[in-house]
Amino acid sequence: MNNSLENTISFEEYIRVKARSVPQHRMKEFLDSLASKGPEALQEFQQTATTTMVYQQGGNCIYTDSTEVAGSLLELACPVTTSVQPQTQPEQQIQVQQPQQVQVQVQVQQSPQQVSAQQLSPQLTVHQPAEQPIHVQVQIQGQAAQPAAPSIQTPSLQSPSPSQLQAAQIQVQHMQAAQQIQAPEIPEEHIPHQQIQAQLVAGQSLAGGQQIQIQTVGALSPPPSQQGSPREGERRVGTASVLQPVKKRKVDMPITVSYAISGQPVATVLAIPQGQQQSYVSLRPDLLTVDSAHLYSATGTITSPTGETWTIPVYSAQPRGDPQQQSITHIAIPQEAYNAVHVSGSPTALAAVKLEDDKEKMVGTTSVVKNSHEEVVQTLANSLFPAQFMNGNIHIPVAVQAVAGTYQNTAQTVHIWDPQQQPQQQTPQEQTPPPPQQQQQQQLQVTCSAQTVQVAEVEPQSQPQPSPELLLPNSLKPEEGLEVWKNWAQTKNAELEKDAQNRLAPIGRRQLLRFQEDLISSAVAELNYGLCLMTREARNGEGEPYDPDVLYYIFLCIQKYLFENGRVDDIFSDLYYVRFTEWLHEVLKDVQPRVTPLGYVLPSHVTEEMLWECKQLGAHSPSTLLTTLMFFNTKYFLLKTVDQHMKLAFSKVLRQTKKNPSNPKDKSTSIRYLKALGIHQTGQKVTDDMYAEQTENPENPLRCPIKLYDFYLFKCPQSVKGRNDTFYLTPEPVVAPNSPIWYSVQPISREQMGQMLTRILVIREIQEAIAVASASTMH
């Protein structure tokens, strides 16, 4: 016999090989089927078997598979796939859910039409499952007022579902100011004759002969709610999702229909192949993204008593593209005046001022209403402006909002009324401050060109200095980070074009470097280089460089914007952004709390809550968890220098559990660290006041220092948990969320620890904790 048994394996070995390819979440089902059905179970799992591949990219190992990763502790395995919310008026979105398949008729031609990357935009996106990618060109013939419904035919889109395919009709109507359309789930009794209406901006009617082009493009990731759906013919809605280059998976190429309508946002219809309902990542370098427009329609300026000038965004409901609806407001604050506002504006009929003090946050609004004009004066400063103090009071910048029209007067001035500058002289008794029970009314005048309205503001005289936090942001605003990036990219591109004109043309076809204004579509290398340059070149509206804490706040806003729009790049810890973290460290390393000439300490723009918002604190990744532990050790153990953190070790951090005397079942756990370990004498009795302590946070376990410390120990190698020379271990470059080991046995370098600590010392709560500890030590 010529048949050889060299390449054969036993049945038991074949079962082991097959078991390795079964996904983790189906392993129990595979074993049960193997026990009950025997060899037939191997045939059932023939199609579901997947292969895990490992390949090299730079210095990292990239794991590629199509299985779902089980969730880990503290929601660590949750993927960052968030839907893109429309930011501006022209952006539209249609969400359609349909219980059964929709029959789509398409006329297929031999010559496929190509669509350029600039024509594709997922601002109007509908996902529809398809069996295979095809190239189709469809012609729509319609009237100017109401287009005819397109009729499409193709056998390749029909699914062999036992139920009959239902017909759907799409009608496009025109409507003004249509920003977002969401079609709820249609009852089954209305399925045979359902209608889906898509609203477009008025003034753009479909002319006869406009083309609808279809082209295969990279797959976009559907939202997590679409995973594992049993409906095969359900039409789905997805958004552009660009994931981190470390985590890539192979997907099929779907169909994209691009509706090219002149003057309107380009609509993209994406079809995901049937059976692929997991969160996929496109391998294509050219990404379909959402075009983000400018959010500020006009810009005003404000001048402080010291001569500094800042830019105030003036929010408006008018479209940004109309130059007639934009206005510029200049607000000048005299040095000798404060505590009253005098605004000169267009004729109005009514003015109202309301000042409230709620939860240490004062909100002042002035609403001026007319039939065709509305004016709003906001005394809350822009989040990028530092607090300014004069004579024990705060100068509050005033932002003027044009809602229904433009201002008639081009110049507006803010006059501030000082009760101490009245012509009549006060007696020495009157100049003494009254007791806290007595309050003095301060007059606030809002004067328009037609009439004046006076409103009394009650403010305690015994509190001449309101909280400086009134002028500082309480949370991150991603649109501010995007706006700063856009302004810098426009300025930088203009400089590059100007330099290119003065130089000789480069040899070959090398294109000039241009920074994209859309952060989502920016490549990793381009974004890293752009952020590096921003640390030195970013300027505010007046051309002045940002303060270091404000610049750090802007980068945190950019980080949150990336996460909210489907990018999982961590610009503060990923290896791709090492250059950026080094440049940012050079900016922040010499930051000290700012003190005014009167002795007031200006708090930092960056707060602890902001870092939780943009996932810089928590257990989302090994680097984030390490940063969180360093943050808690700095805040509670008061470790302010790199040397102090280097002395921290696993053996020096003690875990303690206390029982409640009244309730033995009630236990509280804490971790303790001996303060100033080197100053205590040998043999000296250690008391409780010598320890710095971190306590539990039962209200929010995801932010509990004890649980995060336990999770850190759980992810560290067993051999290092008793070491007395290190505490911060080096994170592994690429790990799975449910991997048992996240860190190597090597401690992090001194340079890396210094960069992490520099960013932590800028946080407002850290500065306050250090200031309180220093004050208590002096006393």
From Swiss-Prot:
Entry-linked Pfam families: DUF3504
InterPro entries the UniProt entry points to: DUF3504 (IPR021893), ZnF_MYMT-QRICH1 (IPR051284)
Per UniProt, location of the Glycyl lysine isopeptide (Lys-Gly) (interchain with G-Cter in SUMO2) cross-link in this chain: K354, K359
PTM-bearing positions, type Phosphoserine: S346, S467
Disordered as annotated region, ranges: 141-163, 219-242, 420-443
GO biological process, one term: response to endoplasmic reticulum stress
Positions of the CARD domain: 6-48
Cellular localisation: Nucleus; Cytoplasm; Cell membrane
KW Ubl conjugation (keyword) present: yes
N-acetylmethionine carried by residues: M1
Biased composition (Low complexity): 420-430
Keyword Nucleus applies: yes
GO cellular component: cytoplasm; nucleus; plasma membrane
One MF annotation (Gene Ontology) recorded for this entry: DNA binding
Alphabetically ordered keywords of this record: Acetylation, Cell membrane, Cytoplasm, Isopeptide bond, Membrane, Nucleus, Phosphoprotein, Transcription, Transcription regulation, Ubl conjugation, Unfolded protein response
Function description: Transcriptional regulator that acts as a mediator of the integrated stress response (ISR) through transcriptional control of protein homeostasis under conditions of ER stress. Controls the outcome of the unfolded protein response (UPR), an ER-stress response pathway that either promotes recovery of ER homeostasis and cell survival, or triggers the terminal UPR which elicits programmed cell death when ER stress is prolonged and unresolved.
Domain commentary: The CARD domain may be involved in the regulation of caspase activity in the context of programmed cell death.
Name of this chain's protein: Transcriptional regulator QRICH1
Organism this protein belongs to: Bos taurus
Taxonomic path: Eukaryota, Metazoa, Chordata, Craniata, Vertebrata
This protein's encoding gene: QRICH1
